Amino acid sequence: MDQFIKQDETGDLIETGMNVANHFLSAPIQGTNSLSKASIIPGVAPVLIGNPEQKNIQHPTASHQGSKSKGRGSGVRSIIVPPSEAGNGGTQIPEPLFAQTGQGGIVTTVYQDPTIQPTGSYRSVELTKIGKERMINRFVEKPRISTPVTEFKRGGPGAAAQGQTIQEEGIDGNGASAGSKERSGSLSGATLYAHLSLPQQDSTPANVGIAPQSAISANEIMDLLRGMDARLQHLEQKVDKVLAQGSMVTQIKNELSTVKTTLATIEGMMATVKIMDPGNPTGVPVDELRRSFSDHVTIVSGPGDVSFSSSEEPTLYLDELARPVSKPRPAKQTKPQPVKDLAGRKVMITKMITDCVANPQMKQAFEQRLAKASTEDALNDIKRDIIRSAI
């Protein structure tokens, strides 16, 4: 015989079980007065052997179940229908009660009203719930009863403890045995008395009180936060102003680069002029120099042609060094320098003093010097000192 179940057979078994469960759950509850043999579902007749009209219905279980429950006693458990749910014969039962089974495989159902009898659908649901409860209670271990602990004293057990007998604790069902208690065989009292340790709790209880009020320093913290917020806003305003001047800074950089380019061009032109005219100017006009180069004294000794001599200036003169010249040069007169307008420069220097000088004493000293200045050189010196003090 093949010990392995095929996949098709497993699927058929699962489908059959689901059909049986759906049949039990979907079967309507009939309100008949009695349970006839025609209403019994095929397959559960051995369980329902006996007269269904009796008040107490007892059904023996299978032989293998009875052999396992012989040592546990023959207990009988009952299901009691409350009077509120009891009625006349033929009434519909809204919710069937759980049927309980006792030891020995005996199922007993007790009704307070003899007129109410279970119908076929009720018994079907009852049998289904009996099997479910058996499967659940199969793995539940019954509570154990511990034997009292005898008090141990020096010199052996007391007179009251001598008459007590210790019985081994049995277990009713599957599970490990807790063992048996035995008295100490030592009568010398070498082993001291030890108290029984109490069971430990899962958690230690804690006292719950009213939550404390707000701390006193909360107001100080709020004031500090407000101050920090104000400082942050002030810094943000300054940063916004700095960012707003970004375009102006870019424009200043462009103008500065233009000025540097122009200055480099001027320096190149000045170097070219110095190369072309390395001498020092004397202040004599160019026409005068050309005329002095062209006019010269010619001495004719003896007869000869004197037609080449100029007849415009026949008279010669002697200069300061007794040199013969055709005409004495007029004395050089110094031209008076034009008086420049210094009012505009004074206004500019006054503005520089106001913007660049922060020290009140230095500002007053510059204003006094500006009032006394009457030449351009004095104004330039004042302007130079203002720039140095600002740096």
Swiss-Prot record:
Residues 216-279 are annotated as: Multimerization. The keyword Phosphoprotein applies. Residues 54-65 have a biased composition (Polar residues). Keywords: Coiled coil, Phosphoprotein, Viral RNA replication. The modification Phosphothreonine is found at T10, T16, T91, T150, T165, T250, T258, T282, T298, T375. InterPro entries: P/V_Pprotein_paramyxoviral. Essential cofactor of the RNA polymerase L that plays a central role in the transcription and replication by forming the polymerase complex with RNA polymerase L and recruiting L to the genomic N-RNA template for RNA synthesis. Also plays a central role in the encapsidation of nascent RNA chains by forming the encapsidation complex with the nucleocapsid protein N (N-P complex). Acts as a chaperone for newly synthesized free N protein, so-called N0, allowing encapsidation of nascent RNA chains during replication. The N-terminus consists of a long intrinsically disordered tail. The central part contains the coiled-coil multimerization domain (MD or OD). Forms a four-stranded coiled coil structure. The C-terminus constitutes the alpha-helical X domain (XD) that binds to the nucleocapsid (N-RNA complex) and the L polymerase. This is Phosphoprotein.
